[in-house]
Each structure stands twice: as structure tokens, then as C-alpha cells.
């Protein structure tokens, strides 16, 4: 069976193999077909990472995180780091984070206060038994954390912060309340509610919000309401900080692409009967989504969204999410470029792209 076409992965992976024990095990964990071999690699990987963090000497881990040869190896490595950073013994701390993606629209620059609506949030969470443990014997930071601050925390910092309650309290002191800057126009952001508890919160982590999704959205809508700004909030599942960061970053970029795409389609339809969409990979770890008229006679200024691939992004999922959006918007003229574009080169218009090697994914799954 032929595999469906996936755009080229142009992330800057190492060109020669790296002799790093962590990467060797992470690669085996990601790619070995033997369950026994994967289990052994997983155990060795976690043991090695645990030893490095406990000795506060993890240069090899930092190297491995920047030199993974593919997305699967990187994901295996990060999953192992995440496992080691969970509360493993009684008395250790389990950190958790709840991402909130915010779509903002305003006619001038604004500052959004990020205080945590603790009472309303706890009342909402307590209504759902599968989320209730987040409110029992837990401690929450009284304000939301911005993505740049949370992503700047090292595995070594998280390791120290999970040792006991005293270390967790010291860790919380590193954060400070900062308003979120909303630029003029439309923008998409992600912030995080951060807290800690014991091992009993672990079953909640990664659970789908289910029926709690809409009530939680209403809590954030009311708490973050700002005069002169239109806000839409999208709460995501509670998770460990590392996984919450990955979920939040991916969803923020996906929602930014959705907002850009619908705006571009609307503006082109005002001037042309048919919208043409071109999708192509570009060297440097980017996927470009371009919108224009199908007919060169109606072409307008190209509107292009650039997706910067994170280390954990799966291109096939990014592609499929975009294709689903195009179907929802009733766009039929879509063209996937088979070959990656050189770095800094421009994405061709729809009319130009049809002369290049590619296909329409709605009518052909294969090149």
C-alpha cells in the first residue's frame, strides 16, 4: 500500500550521526519494531536522564535535545525527560499546567491583566469528578504565565522543583505577574495556569476536558474580558509542563493559521470567483500556505502564512488539519508542491504552481 504524500521535512537535522548514548536509545525507542528492545531502551534512557539531573550535570542531555536526527527520536527523548520529571516517589511534587489559547482583536495596542480567577476556576473544576483532584491539596500560581517564561525553564530547574514542597515554593518565587501585550489588529497567544500537587493529580494529566471544555472557556472569557478588545479563549487539557508547552504552542500556531486563512479567503472572494491555495515546504523548517485567485487575471497581493515547524510537529497532522479547514471553507483548488523551496525563496502563486511538480490532495492522495 502506497503511503499518502507528506510534505518534505526541511528542519535542520544533523547531516552526520551523533555518537550520544541518549540519542542512540531514543532512536531505538522511536524506530525499533521489537517491543522488548523498545522497553529496554526506554528504561536505559530514563535511568541515564535521571542520573544526569540528580547530579545537575546534563550537558549530554542538552546536546541530545538539539541534535536529534528526526522528529520521532526527539519525541522519544522528550517523553523520557517528561517521565523522569513526574513525581515518582511519595513526597515528590507533581507540576501541572493548563494552556489557554487566546485569539484577540483590538483597534489599538492593549495590555491584558493575567490574574487567575481562582474561585471561579475551582468551582468549575469541582463540578467534574475527573478534574476534581486539581483542586485538592494543590497550590496554584495566582496569575497566568506567558509562554516565553515557561519555555525558558530547564529540565534541571524542573527536577529541583519537584523534590519537595519547600523546593516547589522556592521555584514559584521566580515568576512575576506580567500583563499580556495585545498588538493592534488580530493576534493569537497562549498562556498557562501553573500549579503543583502530589502524585494523586497524575491521572488527570492529558485527559480530554470533555464536558468541562465549554464551562472552562466561559470562566476564562469572563476573567480575561477587556474593554476595547474582543477575546476568544480556548482552554486545553491539563498536562505536565513540558507536554502543556508543546500542546499550547501547536494549538496557538494552528489557530493563528485558521484565523489567517479564513481572513485571506474572505478578502480574495470579494475580488475573484475562485480561491487558489498553494502549500509547500521551504528549507529551514517552514511550511508555507499561500492564498490567491486561481486565475492570474484576478490575482491580488499574495497572502502567505508561514508555519514554523517545532521539533515535535508532525507534518502529516499539520497538513490534514489545514485540509480539513479548506474543506470546511469549500475550497477545491488546492495544490501541494512536491519539492521543497530553497531558503528565502517566494511561494509561487496558484497559477504558477500548476506548472510545477505537485498535486491536489482532494482528488489524488498520491503524487
Task: Indicate residue ranges for each PLM-predicted region.
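Detector for methionine-enriched segments
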Residues: 1, 45, 52-53, 65-67, ...
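Charged, amphipathic alpha-helical stretches
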Residues: 1-74
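Long amphipathic alpha-helical coiled-coil/heptad-repeat bundle
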Residues: 45, 49, 54-151
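Extended, non-transmembrane interaction/recognition domains
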Residues: 105-349
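C-terminal recognition-helix end and immediately following basic linker
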Residues: 346, 360-367
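Short cysteine-rich clusters marking metal-coordination/redox-active sites
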Residues: 348-357
Amino acid at each position: 500500500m502506497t503511503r499518502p504524500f507528506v510534505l518534505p521535512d526541511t528542519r535542520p537535522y544533523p547531516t552526520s550521526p551523533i555518537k550520544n548514548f541518549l540519542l542512540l536509545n531514543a532512536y531505538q525507542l522511536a524506530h525499533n519494531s521489537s517491543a522488548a528492545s523498545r522497553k529496554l531502551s526506554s528504561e536505559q534512557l530514563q535511568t541515564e536522564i535521571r542520573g544526569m539531573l540528580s547530579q545537575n550535570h546534563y550537558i549530554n542531555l542538552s546536546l541530545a535535545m538539539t541534535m536529534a536526527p528526526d522528529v520521532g527520536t526527539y519525541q522519544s527523548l522528550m517523553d523520557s525527560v517528561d517521565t523522569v520529571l513526574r513525581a515518582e516517589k511519595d513526597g515528590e511534587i507533581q507540576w501541572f499546567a493548563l494552556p489557554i489559547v487566546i485569539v484577540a482583536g483590538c483597534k489599538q495596542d492593549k495590555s491584558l491583566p493575567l490574574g487567575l480567577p481562582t474561585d471561579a476556576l475551582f468551582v468549575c473544576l469541582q463540578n467534574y469528578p475527573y478534574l476534581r483532584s486539581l483542586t485538592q491539596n494543590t497550590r496554584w500560581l495566582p496569575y497566568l504565565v506567558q509562554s516565553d517564561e515557561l519555555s525558558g525553564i530547564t529540565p534541571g530547574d524542573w527536577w529541583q522543583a519537584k523534590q519537595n514542597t519547600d523546593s516547589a515554593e522556592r521555584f514559584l518565587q521566580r515568576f512575576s505577574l506580567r500583563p499580556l501585550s495585545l498588538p493592534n489588529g488580530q493576534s493569537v497567544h497562549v498562556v498557562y495556569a501553573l500549579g503543583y500537587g502530589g502524585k494523586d493529580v497524575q491521572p488527570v494529566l492529558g485527559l480530554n476536558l470533555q464536558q468541562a471544555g465549554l464551562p472552562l472557556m466561559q470562566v476564562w472569557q469572563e476573567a480575561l474580558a477587556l474593554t476595547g478588545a474582543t477575546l476568544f479563549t480556548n482552554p486545553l487539557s491539563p498536562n505536565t509542563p513540558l507536554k502543556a508547552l508543546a500542546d499550547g504552542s501547536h494549538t496557538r500556531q494552528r489557530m493563528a493559521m485558521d484565523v489567517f486563512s479564513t481572513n485571506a479567503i474572505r478578502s480574495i472572494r470579494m475580488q475573484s470567483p475562485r480561491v487558489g491555495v498553494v502549500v509547500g515546504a521551504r528549507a529551514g523548517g517552514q511550511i508555507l500556505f499561500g492564498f490567491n485567485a486561481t486565475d492570474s487575471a484576478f490575482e491580488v497581493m499574495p497572502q502567505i502564512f508561514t508555519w514554523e515547524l517545532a521539533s515535535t510537529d508532525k507534518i502529516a497532522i499539520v497538513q490534514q488539519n489545514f485540509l480539513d479547514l479548506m474543506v470546511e471553507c469549500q475550497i477545491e483548488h488546492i495544490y501541494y508542491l512536491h519539492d521543497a523551496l530553497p531558503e528565502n525563496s517566494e511561494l509561487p502563486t496558484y497559477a504558477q504552481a500548476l506548472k510545477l511538480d505537485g498535486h491536489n490532495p482532494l482528488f489524488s492522495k498520491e503524487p
